[in-house]
Structures are given as structure tokens and as C-alpha cells.
């Protein structure tokens, strides 16, 4: 099974970008509550 580096990067970005965005919102919300 060959690993397509471009597909791997695209998948990583597709997962990491929304996750990072949600984490930033979560951190801001917690900071405001405190």
C-alpha cells in the first residue's frame, strides 16, 4: 500500500484545523467563565 503524502497532508489538515478552531473557542469560553 503506497502512502500518498498529499492525501495524508490533506487529511491531517482537514482534521487538525477544525479541532484547533474548536479548542480555541473552548479555551476562550472557559477563560470568560473564570
From Swiss-Prot:
UniProtKB keywords: Chloroplast, Membrane, Photosynthesis, Photosystem II, Plastid, Reaction center, Thylakoid, Transmembrane, Transmembrane helix
Subcellular localization: Plastid, Chloroplast thylakoid membrane
Gene: psbM
GO CC terms, sorted: chloroplast thylakoid membrane; photosystem II
Primary localization class, coarse: plastid
Bilayer topology annotation: Single-pass membrane protein
SUPFAM superfamilies: Photosystem II reaction center protein M, PsbM
Protein name stated in the entry: Photosystem II reaction center protein M
Organism annotation: Coffea arabica (Arabian coffee)
